[in-house]
Regions:
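Secretory targeting signals
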Residues: 1-6
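Structured segments of extracytoplasmic/periplasmic soluble domains
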Residues: 57-60, 66, 84, 88, ...
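Conserved C-terminal helix/tail region of periplasmic/extracytoplasmic solute-binding proteins
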Residues: 301-336
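Secondary-structure end/capping motifs
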Residues: 229-314
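Short, glycine-/small- and polar/acidic-enriched structural segments
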Residues: 34-188, 207
Length: 336
């Protein structure tokens, strides 16, 4: 059975040596004829529902209401997001907690300013009815895990659940090996792979890693320390407007954003977009107690430190990093 891998795939590339070519951010260079500040946001992947808040803020005029003219740039498998950002090619870019740790460790000119996915949508999927109804039950059983995941969440799974490397099987960016073997579980993303599995006739058991303590922030917005220092009001406007975009996308009519998403990425079907929106709402990917206390995009020192300590214990991060150098709570302490 040859089942194509669904559109969704997060692929933030390695930082490499991009810091050496860091340039002035674009915001210092451009204001349009209407007096709006021109900004760019570099996504980690092709246009999809997981960027819906950005596209909704653009499509419904929320950014313009905040004095911003925002360009959303899709990513993809050949796009090195961090290299582009550190070279000054975008004002904001998509990252995660691991990037924030790297910013601090490597003293890179980048800082996280908001986290629009409170839950990392990473999952493991299993077949129903074969005794694999919990993560604990997967110990000793075959798992399809990509190379990148073996350096992050796999180390955590080994520490948390006693998994071993003998369980690992190659992940080929296809669901076919999973679909043909009921004893195999596979990595995936909450917003796509379960949908694809159901389309192929399997209603999977979904193990959400975040629900078991994998507290990685995703859809983290990063910008330059220069932007934070010299134009904090612009950063605040972007964060606030994007938070409003997410609230609108999840709880009002998402059609304006969806039209832009499908125009930028025709492979995104309406049914997959609808599924992804439903999953984000059902599993609390964007909205949690932290966002209710402050705003969508919230971050806390406790969450950053707790996840860092967990990753140090798992051997996924070196000890001794001053992680607060990689993020700031300056822009996420106020209701949007």
């Amino acid at each position: 059975m040859n089942v194509p891998h669904p559109t969704r795939r997060r692929a933030l590339a390695t930082l490499g040596g991009a810091a050496a070519i860091a340039a002035a951010p674009a915001f210092l260079r451009t204001v349009n004829a209407q007096g709006l500040v021109k900004l760019s946001y570099q996504c980690g992947w092709l246009a999809q529902a997981e960027q819906g808040g950005l596209y909704q803020a653009l499509a419904t005029g929320i950014y313009r209401e905040h004095g911003l003219d925002v360009e959303i740039r899709p990513g993809g498998p050949q796009v090195n997001v961090m290299q582009l950002f550190l070279a000054g090619q975008s004002d904001f870019a998509e990252a995660d907690s691991f990037r924030g740790f790297a910013f601090a460790q490597e003293k890179l000119p980048a800082v996280a300013v908001a986290a629009f996915f409170q839950k990392d949508p990473r999952v493991l999927m299993s077949h129903p009815g074969v005794g694999n109804d919990s993560l604990e039950a997967l110990k000793g059983k075959p798992l399809l895990v990509a190379t990148a995941g073996r350096q992050t969440y796999w180390l955590w799974l080994k520490t948390r659940f006693g998994f071993t490397d003998e369980q690992l099987r190659a992940y080929t960016f296809s669901l076919a090996p999973f679909l043909v073997d009921k004893q195999v579980s596979t990595q995936g993303f909450l917003t796509s792979e379960p949908f694809a599995a159901r389309k192929a006739g399997v209603d999977p058991v979904i193990h959400v890693l975040a629900d078991k303590g994998f507290d990685n922030y995703q859809n983290v917005v990063v910008t330059s320390p220069k932007m934070v220092r010299e134009k904090p009001e612009i950063v605040q406007k972007f964060v606030t407007a994007t938070a409003k975009g997410w609230a609108s996308y999840l709880h009002a009519d998402p059609a304006p954003a969806n039209a832009l998403i499908r125009a930028a990425n025709p492979a995104m079907g309406e049914d997959l977009i609808a599924y992804a929106i439903g999953a984000m709402n059902k599993y609390g990917v964007v909205e949690t107690a932290d966002t209710q206390a402050t705003m969508i995009g919230a971050m806390t020192h406790q969450r950053w430190k707790g996840f860092y300590d967990t990753m140090v214990a798992a051997g996924a991060q070196p000890a001794g990093t001053e992680i607060r150098n990689g993020y700031t709570l300056q822009f996420v302490g106020k209701p949007a």
